[in-house]
Structure formats: C-alpha cells, structure tokens
From Swiss-Prot:
Role played: Catalyzes the hydrolysis of N-succinyl-L,L-diaminopimelic acid (SDAP), forming succinate and LL-2,6-diaminopimelate (DAP), an intermediate involved in the bacterial biosynthesis of lysine and meso-diaminopimelic acid, an essential component of bacterial cell walls.
Cofactor requirements of the protein: Zn(2+); Co(2+)
CDD domains recorded: M20_DapE_proteobac (cd03891)
UniProt-listed PROSITE patterns: ARGE_DAPE_CPG2_2
InterPro entries for the chain: ArgE/DapE_CS (IPR001261), Bact_exopeptidase_dim_dom (IPR036264), DapE_proteobac (IPR005941), Peptidase_M20 (IPR002933), Peptidase_M20_dimer (IPR011650), Peptidase_M20A (IPR050072)
Organism listed in the record: Shewanella sediminis (strain HAW-EB3)
Name of this chain's protein: Succinyl-diaminopimelate desuccinylase
Record-listed E.C. numbers: 3.5.1.18
Gene name, Swiss-Prot/TrEMBL: dapE
Amino acid sequence: MSQDVLTLAQDLISRESVTPLDEGCQQLMADRLSAKGFDIESMVFDDTTNMWARRGNSGPLFCFAGHTDVVPVGDLNRWHTPPFDPVVIDGYLHGRGAADMKGSLAAMLVATERFVEKHPDHNGSIAFLITSDEEGPFINGTTRVIDTLEARNEKITWALVGEPSSTHKLGDIVKNGRRGSLTGNLTVNGIQGHVAYPHLADNPIHNAAPALDELARMKWDNGNEFFPPTSFQIANINGGTGASNVIPGSLEVMFNFRYSTEVTAEELIKRVLNILDAHGLDYDISWTFNGLPFLTGEGPLLDATRDAIKQVTGTDTDPQTSGGTSDGRFIAPTGAHVIELGPVNATIHKVNECVKVADLEQLALCYEVILEKLLC
C-alpha cells in the first residue's frame, strides 16, 4: 500500500493546531497543490486562517472542503500516546485529528495529486476550501470565505466535505444533508426574596416550569423521508443564589432546536414566543442561528459518491441527515450540492483518537474515483 496518505496525515497531525490555530497545515497543503497547478489564495480573518486553492477557470467547480483545526486534547494522562506525536499501533493511526479531520485532508490532497497526474486536462475546475475555524465559533472560517466567493460570483457546483461520516466501516454512511440549528437564550425575570415570604417575591422557576414543560412536550413537526422530526432540547438551566432560603430573581435557560425542512426558524421562534406569552412570563430572549437545514438529492454528486464507495469498498452506502452541523451548512445555501464523506467517527473528540490506516488509503481512492466520475 502507498505510504503517501499516511505520511501526509502524520505530518498534519504533528502540528498542534488547536482551534483557531493552523500551525502551518494549510501552507503544507498549499505548497503541494501549487506544484499541481493550483492558484493559492490565503484569506486571514482575525485569528482564523483560511485557504482557497483552485485549479482551472471553467465550470463545473468541484470543491473539497475541510478544516485544519482540532479540538483540545483534554486530560493528557488519559492518552496512551502523545496526541501530537502520531504513531501507528496495530494498523491504527493515533493522534488528535486523525479522524477529525486531518486523515481526510491527507486523503483529499493525495487523491487530487493522483487525479491531476492522470488527467492533466480534466474538465471543469477543482478547489480546496480549508479553514482553521470549524471546531471553534465558526465566525471567521468557511462562512467568510463563502461570502468572498459569492461577492465575486465564484460558484461551487459540488462540495465534498471530509467530515467523519462513517459509523462502523468506511463508507457505510454519507451525509447528504443536515438539520438546521437554532439556539435560544431565555431569561425569565422574577423578584428575589426570602423563601419564608413568597408573597413578597415572584419565583421565576415556578413561573417558567409549565412553559418549559409545554415546550419540551411539543411536537414541532413530523419530519419527512429525509429528516427526523424537529428536536427541542434544554441544554443549560441556571437559577438561584446557591442558598436554600432565597427565592431567585431570575432564571436562565439555554435551549436548542435541530430542525427539519418541514419548519423554518422563523416559525419556531413565533411558536416559542406564543407559548411564553400564553404563560404570562416576564422574559427576555435572544436567538442564535447556527445553520439552515439542507439536502442534496439525487444527482451527479450523490451518484458519483455512491458508485465510488461501492467500487472501492464494496459497501452500499446509506445517505443520512442525522448528527450535528458541519461547514456544509455555509456552502449549501449558495446552490451547491454538498456531500460529507470521511472515516469512521467512533473516536472523534475523544482521548486516543485514531483511524484505521487502511481506511485512509481507501478514502483517497474513493475521492479519486469521485473526481474521475465528475470531471472526466
């Protein structure tokens, strides 16, 4: 088996690029892409490093998308090996970012190098959109690059995001869409007082409880063939001074919707406000839009991805929309078709993160076949 993917993955993992740091990962990729005829554009916004690399000027435009930043390592004492000293043990590459997603970055780059060597006059264009702000607040990363591309009418036709989509074996699941995400920060106002004199106070916890119960029990929609029903979850709740004899003056609640294409964020907000008002609450609320739902249906990208996985691994992939958000949510609204295909996600964000070495080589082959099916 070729060592190209493994060697590059190890080089990337060895760079301690905890979000929003990049630590030279993008420059390493840029140097290799430049040697294959890519024009490199670095886009730095505040503390975030982004790279837009493109080969070709015509359409259709196929884009590999991913991130060089990783999450913090956590308790070092729980790691069997140093997280930024990548090592292969029993066929698995260990290190922070091995699965999420430096292994995918290595597979993308090597697949592209091989493809360009075989097909120097390929149809259309190939691009890389790489950020160091996917694991962080996602303010200055992919979303800013997309804004720049949109401003100059540079349109992505197909985007393949290298997020670890697989569950049990490589390619068993791809993501052809994601649910929308909407977060609410609610403050219910009351009057602080002594618990022995409740008539002189106004308990916001007691007041809010029926409304929160109604929100938690609400059936927001029925979902559809592509998306499960919309989910409402209370993520954080805080009220009180810590003393047993004080009625709190306020209650803070953070909740999140993961919503389907059957409902809009505006509809969810309206329904929440109606419930809060119906219970007569004195409240303040703010909203954070984390991403719209998107879906890539049948078409060239999904067909090429499905066929490539079958050809390389023998697996019949299952397109799904479950799980969290990804940077695909910033690309899809431009009209691009978006698919996520990456390694097994069993150890992502955990101590002792690892990925099967053989999967990285197969992933590179999948990416190469997808390029061939779309641009040859």
